[in-house]
UniProtKB/Swiss-Prot annotation:
It comes from Pseudomonas putida (strain ATCC 47054 / DSM 6125 / CFBP 8728 / NCIMB 11950 / KT2440). It catalyses: betaine aldehyde + NAD(+) + H2O = glycine betaine + NADH + 2 H(+). This is Betaine aldehyde dehydrogenase. Gene3D superfamilies: Aldehyde Dehydrogenase, Chain A, domain 1, Aldehyde Dehydrogenase, Chain A, domain 2. The keyword Metal-binding applies. The modification Cysteine sulfenic acid (-SOH) is found at residue 286.
Length: 490
């Protein structure tokens, strides 16, 4: 018997059975335990969710800005009241350490919802004078029914990042969580209903991206799709979204981000930043700075500091708050990461730390991979070029600023980048030349609600968070008003 039984779909403000008996398993990657049997949505369920969302969206959009704001703020309050419960469920489902989910995942997701709840009354149009007797005004109107498709690494946080601006602008959202980690998004749907969100304004459909995701993105009455995931899948989603209608799209995709450490940097601080850029959340963060560039003359000292810090990582049961490094999200993903590690060894990179699956004692039950650091890396190695999405750092050396900027930009990705230096002029000079959408100077990883998040090149389209994201969930209607006479040319 699974701990959480059978998980149903969430449509029109309630849990409902899917149109078929098909289910998939939610598995705890730390132990292999089956947590739940999750129902697979059918195409008929998708249609039911769209119809429900259309009804709910009309009710939601007709409310005043202050009414919508109050409901979203109530959802924030409930999220914070249930923080620990939701965090533990996220830990069980993803394998992320409770020390992380308790203080980050729900907390930061609630912050984003609170941020957009505060912006609801600020959605406004413009008045543009033309001449004494005529002017134009604009209205920002909601799109209608939107779709969010989440990744498996930050399930509830991503659902909040996508739903917060969508709902704030008066839209409805149908959300499809990753098949790997579906549980907390269903709880979010409950919370929205409890807070007073009209039925149908936030529906959750569980199932595979190939089926449920495609049915949603190809649906002609969906107005926007916001997707987080890999670049290859993102391209398919974009093509699918335009196959039946011209939909708005936001894509937050993959990365192979550079962290450049300059010769004048505080090496201890740089090592701390490199650790956060590679091993936070067991390395499963899209913005990770996995290509660490260090001046050649500083390499040995930097390696020593990294090895010392890796030895202090507390790998263990993610339910234990003392643990700060848990398993990977699934056994399938573990095999993918181990394949990259094997490739790194085969291509001549030197293993400084880790480089193996952990199998001692209870580790054997889970998808645990040791924090891994490769050094003596070159730009043409597979581990340097491809996104691994795991706890694998690659150390590379460089000689000049011009060289490292060129090499940092020599990638199809452009999600994030960082610079460590005590020279603020150099910091800005380098950052301004890096082809990345999210950049940090002497820091890594923080993405507050106010900060637009998104990539260059094949790392994404559009932005999440920040004021500009709210506008992406509206469309502008322009209205010209003539107060005087009208002269026809006929």
């Amino acid at each position: 018997m699974a701990r959480f039984g059978t998980q149903k779909l969430y449509i029109d403000g309630a849990y409902v059975d899917a149109g078929s008996d098909a289910t998939f398993e939610a598995i705890n990657p730390a132990t292999g335990e089956v947590l739940a049997h999750v129902q697979r949505a059918t195409e008929a369920d998708v249609e039911k969710a769209v119809e429900s969302a259309e009804r709910g969206q009309k009710v939601w959009a007709a409310m005043t800005a202050m009414q919508r704001s109050r409901i979203l703020r109530r959802a924030v309050d409930i999220l914070r009241e249930r923080n620990d419960e939701l965090a533990m469920l996220e830990t069980l489902d993803t394998g992320k350490s409770y020390s992380e989910t308790r203080y980050v995942d729900i907390v930061t997701g609630a912050d984003v919802l609170e941020y957009y709840a505060g912006l609801v009354p600020a959605i406004e149009g413009e008045q543009i004078p033309l001449r004494e007797s005529s002017f134009v005004y604009t209205r920002r109107e909601p799109l209608g029914v939107t779709v969010g498709i989440g990744a498996w690494n930050y399930p509830i946080q991503i659902a909040l990042w996508k739903s917060a601006p969508a709902l704030a602008a008066g839209n409805a959202m149908i959300f499809k969580p990753s098949e790997v980690t579906s549980l907390t998004t269903l709880k979010l749907a409950e919370i929205y209903t409890e807070a007073g969100l009209p039925n149908g304004v936030f529906n959750v459909l569980t199932g595979s991206g190939r089926e449920v995701g495609t049915w949603l993105t190809e649906h002609p009455r969906i107005e926007k799709v916001s997707f987080t995931g890999g670049t290859t899948t993102g391209k398919k989603v974009m093509a699918s979204a335009s196959s039946s209608s011209l939909k708005e799209v936001t894509m937050e995709l993959g990365g192979k981000s550079p962290l450049i450490i300059c010769a004048d940097a505080d090496l201890d601080k740089a090592a701390d930043i490199a650790m956060m850029a590679n091993f936070y959340s067991s390395g499963q963060v899209c913005t990770n700075g996995t290509r660490v560039f260090i001046p050649a003359e500083m390499k040995a000292a930097f390696e020593a500091k990294i090895a010392e810090r890796v030895a202090r990582i507390r790998v263990g049961n993610p339910e234990d708050e003392n643990t700060n490094f848990g398993p990977l999200v699934s056994f399938q993903h573990m095999e993918s990461v181990l394949g990259y590690i094997a490739k790194g060894k085969e291509e001549g990179a030197r293993v400084l730390c880790g480089g193996e699956r952990l199998t001692a004692g209870d580790f054997a039950k889970g998808a645990f991979v040791a924090p891994t650091v490769f050094t003596d890396c070159t730009d043409d190695m597979t581990i340097v070029k491809e996104e691994i999405f795991g706890p694998v750092m690659s150390i590379l050396t460089y000689e000049t600023e011009e060289e490292v900027i060129r090499r940092a930009n020599d990638t199809d990705y452009g999600l994030a980048a960082g610079v460590c230096t005590n020279d603020i002029t150099r910091a800005h000079r380098i950052i301004h030349k890096l082809e990345a959408g999210i950049c940090w100077i002497n820091a890594w990883g923080e993405s507050p609600a106010e900060m637009p998040v998104g990539g260059y090149k094949q790392s994404g389209v559009g932005r999440e968070n920040g004021v500009s994201s709210l506008a992406q969930y509206t469309r502008i209607k322009s209205v010209q008003v003539e107060l005087g006479g009208y002269n026809s040319v006929f």
